[in-house]
């Protein structure tokens, strides 16, 4: 049976959730462009919402589509969260707006068109996270032939931290606003079954104001949080974090997905 949220297990002040199978903790912090943590927001800082997620069963990570593939119709994340009985939900990947990359959702293959300038993030069936940098057909086959399993894959990218190494070079053929300080949705892992989502605010946020991070800043930030693997899952101004069917990030930014 799927795990269902217990309404009594949400923490006060949108602080997270805790039951026997799931632990979620939400923390807000403020960072400079040099990736130094400061006590309060101010000139030149960026607000970062960190969501720590610890699961006990790999099937607790689920993906959902707004409409059946390949429809481009959209649904707000809050509604999708409610439809899918999600304690926590985030948006990302944007894969429907191009025709490349490897896309699996809940073990079902939707697309398998590897491109060497796209990094692939994999959540395996054991709750582990892997990133294939520059996903050629051969690298994808190698992963599968070496016993790699697939529950979900994502192709927005790029990888920011791979096996503990913070990236400092990114493929210029990818149009993910590499040099633009922006809102970023970073999905990362510390150990299997233990994930961290970093939602950084961008220039659209007014209260408090934020600058946002370019890809290099996002990678350094992920490293500062101790992530072993981290992936740029979304960005721009549409990053949405939903807890208990309510959007909890960037309250002063009206945009949402």
Give residue spans per PLM region.
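Gly/Ser/Thr/Pro-rich low-complexity, intrinsically disordered segments
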Residues: 1-257
């Amino acid at each position: 049976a799927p795990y269902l949220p217990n309404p009594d297990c949400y923490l006060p002040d949108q602080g997270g959730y805790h039951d026997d199978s799931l632990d979620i903790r939400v923390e807000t912090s403020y960072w400079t462009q040099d990736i130094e943590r400061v006590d309060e927001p101010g000139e030149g800082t960026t607000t970062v919402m960190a969501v720590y997620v610890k699961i006990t069963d790999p099937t607790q990570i689920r993906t959902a589509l707004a409409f059946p593939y390949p429809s481009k119709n959209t649904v707000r994340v809050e509604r999708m969260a409610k439809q899918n009985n999600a304690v926590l939900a985030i948006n990302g990947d944007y894969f429907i707006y191009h025709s490349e990359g490897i896309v699996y959702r809940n073990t079902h293959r939707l697309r398998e068109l590897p491109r060497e300038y796209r990094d692939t993030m994999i959540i395996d069936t054991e709750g582990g996270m892997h990133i294939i940098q520059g996903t050629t057909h051969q690298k994808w086959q190698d992963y599968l032939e070496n016993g790699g399993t697939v529950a979900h894959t994502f192709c927005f990218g790029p990888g920011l931290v791979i096996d503990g190494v913070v990236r400092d070079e990114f493929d210029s053929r990818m149009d993910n606003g590499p040099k633009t300080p922006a809102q970023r949705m970073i999905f990362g892992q510390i150990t299997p079954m233990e994930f961290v989502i970093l939602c950084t605010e961008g220039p659209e946020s007014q209260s408090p104001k934020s600058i946002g991070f370019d890809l290099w800043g996002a990678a350094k930030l992920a490293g500062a949080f101790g992530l072993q693997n981290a992936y740029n899952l979304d960005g721009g101004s549409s990053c949405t974090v939903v807890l208990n069917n309510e959007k909890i990030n960037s309250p002063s930014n009206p945009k949402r997905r």
